[in-house]
């Protein structure tokens, strides 16, 4: 049972994702989306506008691609770098496929950034959860002391949260878009890290 725990949890998340999709299609998640938007935008000003634009940049294509190139070029362990970039690539493909299948339009609210693709699931959130999530995985597996591992992981874990909230605040996504994105990326990460752990010794020793 323990051996397949990640697969079981990933399967549960897929079921939850399907439920979210059904609720969206049936229009039964409107209240959740509206309440979340009202909470996030209960206080708006120029400072917050700019702050959330910075947060959203941390999940943007430009930043994520730049980070992946940096990792590939400067990370000594090329297999580990390849795994990180590969995880992001898988997430990107999954996001685009789901967007094309689901075809949800963007929210009609005060929008501070312009987006032209479909809304569900949030690409910024999926990319952020995947990149920072896989980095957390490797940090926790590293030889750093426990305090350093936890501190770095907590800081990295804040980034996808900030990205997700920023997408709602900026009017780019419904709350259910970022929720679906987080669920999808987490399910993918669970499956990916299962296989990474099986071959971790080979990956960790590779240069």
Predicted segments with their positions:
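Alpha-helical transmembrane spans of integral membrane proteins, capturing the lipid-embedded, hydrophobic core
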Residues: 11-15, 65, 84, 88-92, ...
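Aromatic-anchored segments of alpha-helical transmembrane domains
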Residues: 16-20, 90-97, 158-167
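Membrane-interface loops
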Residues: 30-31, 73-145
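N-terminal transmembrane-helix/juxtamembrane module of multi-pass inner/ER membrane proteins
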Residues: 1-61, 100-102, 106-112
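Alpha-helical transmembrane segments of integral membrane proteins
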Residues: 5-10, 52, 79-87, 148-155, ...
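Juxtamembrane membrane-interface segments at transmembrane alpha-helix termini
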Residues: 45-50, 94-105, 163-169, 191-196
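Short helix-capping/hinge motifs at transmembrane helix termini and TM-loop junctions
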Residues: 24-26, 75-76, 102-103, 170-171, ...
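Membrane-embedded catalytic cores of phosphoryl/pyrophosphoryl-handling enzymes
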Residues: 111-207
